[in-house]
């Protein structure tokens, strides 16, 4: 029976995955786990769309220099697109956690000093903070974070799928082994890496990161953001660490 079921899978091998070639040998040790997840998902309604599940692995393995960990995809249909915290460009209003990330982004390395930025805040449903002198990043135009990924920011979720409307529903289904393998491989390279870990679930992966510098705070959720996320300056701190390691800083503007 198991062999029969295994033929009905979304992914038979790592080589079939829509990922960058440099990730394929990294994920080869968890190929069986990925195949079994494909069996589970073949009979399950899930988000994000199947072609986006492995989007975080579509960027070069060797280019990663910042890791931002999420928990699982947004459970609202149309929001999740395979990168932690990121949304499709047309999503309005923003998910509340991303709303708070953008508030901290602007407070840390950005400014809302002009009327266009103020209007953008209203369009996105963000309560715009005051201007911050001497900073460079304007309010993002939307919730699409691919510009970060293009610079080497790995936007990983611990669990890569979710049942629509049921946050956390695919926890314990096998994704943890896959992302553990990926995180360990990133940490074991002889290359600069900084991890940004928001919330207890994200901080559970710290044990896989060896001596990788980690920037930790509470989660940007509205339930916790005021208890240490706001004011934590993760973006400027990450750049300071990258600079100290001889790596190019991230341009956090979107």
Swiss-Prot record:
Q: Name one GO biological process term.
A: base-excision repair, AP site formation via deaminated base removal
Q: Cite the active-site annotation.
A: 72
Q: Which UniProt keywords apply?
A: Cytoplasm, DNA damage, DNA repair, Hydrolase
A Pfam family the protein falls into: UDG
PANTHER family recorded = URACIL-DNA GLYCOSYLASE
Question: Could you say which protein family the record assigns here?
Answer: Belongs to the uracil-DNA glycosylase (UDG) superfamily. UNG family.
Q: By its UniProt entry, which NCBIfam families does this protein fall under?
A: PRK05254.1-1
User: Which protein are we looking at?
Assistant: Uracil-DNA glycosylase
Q: Which organism is it from?
A: Corynebacterium glutamicum (strain ATCC 13032 / DSM 20300 / JCM 1318 / BCRC 11384 / CCUG 27702 / LMG 3730 / NBRC 12168 / NCIMB 10025 / NRRL B-2784 / 534)
């Amino acid at each position: 029976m198991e062999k029969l079921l295994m033929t009905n899978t979304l992914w038979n091998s790592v080589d079939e995955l829509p990922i960058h070639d440099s990730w394929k040998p990294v994920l080869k040790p968890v190929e069986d786990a990925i195949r079994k997840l494909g069996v589970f998902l073949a009979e399950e309604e899930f988000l994000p769309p199947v072609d986006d599940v492995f989007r975080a692995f579509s960027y070069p393995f060797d280019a990663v220099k910042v890791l931002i960990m999420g928990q699982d995809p947004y459970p609202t249909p149309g929001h999740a697109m395979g990168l932690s915290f990121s949304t499709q460009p047309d999503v309005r209003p923003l998910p509340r956690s991303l709303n708070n990330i953008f508030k901290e982004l602007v407070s840390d390395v950005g400014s809302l000093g002009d009327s266009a930025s103020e209007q953008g805040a209203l369009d996105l449903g963000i309560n715009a903070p005051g201007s911050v002198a001497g900073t460079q990043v304007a309010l993002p135009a939307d919730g699409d974070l691919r510009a970060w990924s293009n610079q080497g920011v790995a936007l990983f979720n611990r669990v890569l799928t979710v049942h629509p409307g049921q946050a956390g529903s695919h926890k314990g289904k096998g994704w943890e082994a896959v992302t553990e393998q990926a995180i360990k491989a990133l940490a074991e390279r002889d290359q600069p890496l900084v991890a940004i870990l928001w919330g207890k679930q994200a901080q559970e992966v710290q044990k896989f990161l060896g001596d990788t510098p980690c920037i930790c705070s509470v989660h940007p959720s509205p339930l916790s953001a005021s208890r240490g996320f706001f004011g934590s300056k993760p973006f400027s701190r990450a750049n300071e660490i990258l600079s100290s390691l001889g790596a190019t800083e991230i341009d956090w503007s979107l």
